[in-house]
Amino acid sequence: MHANDPTSTDRTDSHRADSHGSDSHGSDRHRGRPKIRFRKAVALLTGALLAGASLTLATPPAGAATADPGAAPAAPAASAAEDFQQVTLAKGEPETGEPMSLAVLPDRSVLHTSRDGELRITDSAGNTRLAGKLDVYSHDEEGLQGVGIDPGFADNRFIYLYYAPPLDTPAGDAPETGTAADFAPFDGVNRLSRFVLNADGTLDNASEKKILDVPATRGICCHVGGDIDFDAAGNLYLSTGDDSNPFQSDGYTPIDERANRNPVFDAQRTSGNTNDLRGKILRVKVNADGSYAIPDGNLFAPGTDKTRPEIYAMGFRNPFRFSVDKETGILYVGDYGPDAGAADPARGPAGQVEFARVTEPGNFGWPYCTGDNDAYVDYDFATKTSGAAFDCAAPKNTSPNNTGLTDLPPAQAAWIPYDGASVPEFGTGSESPMGGPVYHFDPSLDSPVKFPEAYDGDFFAGEFGRRWIKRISSDGDGTVQSINDVPWTGTQVMDMAFGPDGALYVLDYGVSWFGGDENSALYRIENATDGHSPVAQAAADKQSGQAPLKVKFSSAGSTDADGDTLTYSWDFGDGGTSTSANPTHTYKANGTYTATLTAKDPDGRTGSSSVQIVVGNTAPKVTLQLPEDGQLFAFGDAVPFKVRVTDPEDGTIDCAKVKVTFVLGHDSHGHPVTSANGCSGTIQTSADGGHDEDANIFGVFDAEYTDGGGGGQQALTTHDQSVVQPKHRQAEHFGKSQGVTITERAGAHGGKTVGDINNRDWISFEPYVLSNATKLTARVSSAGTGGKLEVRAGSPTGRLLGSATVPVTGGWETFQDVTASLSKAPRGTTTLYLVFKGRGTGALYDVDDFTFTTR
């Protein structure tokens, strides 16, 4: 992810968060069942919605790794106990939507946003409801992004939202080439507004005060940013993305200055522009009337020609998540980077991402420099010739799309840049940094769940694609002292914040593409010094339908960390109750009900879980029949699609309401590229895939249908999706493996191979449809003994589809192609296995990449 979202940014770029360890590559994600809002056809409200369920987590070792070999060892853990549990406050798309951002209120309730414009509020016990909804423009990554709580909320009840108002923007994609008049209809804004949150937890839409509009080039991807935070002085900080398309720059910097090109392909107009608010972190002081003042000490003083005084820091690509340390004023920023698989002296460095530590206003380099001030090359997209490398100490913006200063402030190096396994404590996989909060221990706070004193002053970093949270300790000048694991169980970290109780609140995106799913969640990680609560798990065999609706409920999966026997009670939301573990209940009247399971241990501790039931309207069933899940394709293909939809209340389906979107998948995030309406048709994919050809890219087709409601109940949406696999891919982008390692090879495409191969080692990829594949050609090298490469389906010992002999090529950097003819492939979706055979005790051979030939 990168995601702008972590669905969306690209390097590791997300919404999802762009769309990001070693066995979590995006293309190997199981599609699973269809779902409401994004996965294979699950009926309406997918999965159990846990509320107040807790999970005991192992304590990480104190002072684990040292990032700086010369740094002092980490201090020993303080006396405070470390025994964490993870409490599930909300789970599943109905309770999270497409999770984007969170903010914790003084009473421990949590506001969290969904990109479709919905704002939800979840109380400390895990009860979730809709607080309000904004109308939003939602092409590509746009929609509702960040939420922030005014420092004076207890008195004024002000909250802040960053969103894309609909305006009169045309539907569909903006043109990539044309004239200014062609591009102008897609000029829009992303808006920072202040609202009042009513005492009952509902949003007062009429109270909106428009604070700040940030320009936006609509109809074409990517990078919105949109995080909100405050410093101790009450100044508001807002992060903004570069609003630039990375897909036609070969994975390097997008600085296309051609006159007929949509300006979205030139990040010099935004991140490198001192007179533009994009690609920045902005700092303002919001006044009571909704106007704002400029605090002293921003990057450019008010009145400075060709500058915007709101800019605190510039030169960011997509600073999707950041936080302000309230005690020091230091900003910790996760900034996404581009995707080049290897450095090119004619273009610039390989893709990398970074955590930035912003101690004062400055320029952080993009689009001229990245990482540890690694400079890009001034490339002419018209002539395809390279000039000189940019000067990071004195960058100049000479783009015709620049409206600001030519001479820019010097670029600041990243605090922690990383790519691949360059920071051992970060592991491997895609790169998608999420800037989290800094913890400050309060000895006077009477809270049994607050984090230990040993964590005081530590920065909590998230990684969307690698699925971890790390605690980073540093000294006063930022030198990293240690990097420690934070125990949590979840999928893709979207946002984090410490609450007034000293517990860590985490928003989990889930694993779908641009939509919530059954894994999307809101968690509270507590230091469980007073003992552990039960984990309640509620489930239902159906979650929508006509009255009378008979539902079988289940408490299966409910547990207690201490092994105690649990008792159960159910409240079905319509006045009915039960003390059975797995009751059956019939809903007789139309309505939307919340059925809540409470599990209690002998000490009286409880955990709750809930599931929503809609009576009166049945969720539509959506089946994406074409393309098949795992179907082979090549970027540039026109891919046919076919969708089948049924809905009891709608009856005859209006195919104009069926929407099919092509998403460019990269690692574990994606970017919506284009869409079409209809039950059948064809979508033209981009010729280059939009990334470096050596990147881990693939396609995702998403089909959705929203019904017309029924029985007085809300309309329901169901999605189904298929992954389509490129015929050519790098071997190192495997999903799972046995025995092998990823090896750096200068002559390899993308700079890496699958190496250290011994007899019976293997790598796997999923999903794949291989029924029309006739050959697999692999690029290999060997200074070992060579051997045989087998192509199998289903398992390492599954059906043998073909094999190729791998000769000794004369060196690990001497590559040649070998080809296996394929036959007898199973029909439908399977898992592809490359199994390695050979004699001897040393490494046999390396595999660089492979390409399928199809009928």
What are these regions (language model features)?
Residues 2-5, 31-67:
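Secretory targeting and sorting signals
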Residues 544-551, 582-586, 594-598, 603-605, ...:
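Extracytoplasmic
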Residues 561-568, 653-658:
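Solvent-exposed loop segments of extracellular immunoglobulin-like
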Residues 480-500:
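Conserved blade-ending motifs and adjacent loop-strand segments that build the rim/top face
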Residues 104-107, 151-155, 230-233, 326-328, ...:
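Residue-level detector of Asp-centered blade-edge/turn motifs that repeat once per structural unit
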Residues 97, 116, 142-144, 166-167, ...:
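Beta-propeller domain segments
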Residues 75-94, 205-208:
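A short helix->beta-strand "capping" segment at the edge of beta-propeller domains
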Residues 174-200, 204-229:
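Asp-box/WD-like beta-propeller blade repeats and closely related beta-sheet repeat scaffolds
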